[in-house]
Amino acid sequence: MNTQRSIRTCVVGAILFAAVATACNKEDDKAVKGRTGPNGAARDTVSDLALNEDGLGQIQIGMTLDEAVNMGLLNERPDIKQACDFVFPAVGAGIPFGVNVMVVKGKVARIDVDTGTVTTEDGAKIGDSEDKIKSIYGDELKVSPHKYIEGGHYLTVMGDSASAGKAMVFETDGKQVTMFRAGRIPEVEWVEGCG
């Protein structure tokens, strides 16, 4: 009898947890209250999160970690290494799991994406074929061999941002995009992250 009651309690708890989690996710899809972009414009929805060479949503390459923490975008990291470390988006910032932010000497240097829910502002995403990336970026793309994946590539978009010292890099397995990132040169080109 106690076993049945325990099972029933667990099932009811799981259903309630799922309902709360679903409601929270729906809230994340709505406006992020009180948040503004670097130019002062309000950020309306999570759909505004498209990666480009300058950043992802309100997280901008070159902003300080303190600015991002104070805006509620990134988690505070009192233990952060001064040279280089990764920081995760703050819960409630509307940034999906799978986005990691590299901070070098206290400033956002690069943003890594390994989730299919984030695209570039040109619509490129994880799972896209190399040919699709080449068709989107054309002559702006530089192709180089992947350091660790046989047959894989780094597809680097320099474009106009190269003069500003920024780029975007797509990693592939030779067929499709497995992850991508944007940020300052040289950090965006570091294969091992901070390693």
Could you tell me what each predicted segment is?
Residues A182-G195:
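Short, low-complexity, Pro/Ser/Thr/Gly-rich segments in the mature regions of secreted, periplasmic
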Residues N25-V46:
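Short, low-complexity, disordered segments immediately C-terminal to signal peptides
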Residues D44, L49-E76:
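Post-signal-peptide N-terminal segment of Sec-exported extracytoplasmic proteins
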Residues N2-V11:
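Bacterial N-terminal signal peptides that target proteins for export
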Residues V32-K33, T64-V104, E130-Q176, A182:
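A cross-family detector of function-defining hotspots
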Residues V20-A23:
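C-terminal motif of bacterial Sec signal peptides marking the signal peptidase cleavage site
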Residues N52-I59, T115-A124:
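Second-shell loop/turn segments in exported
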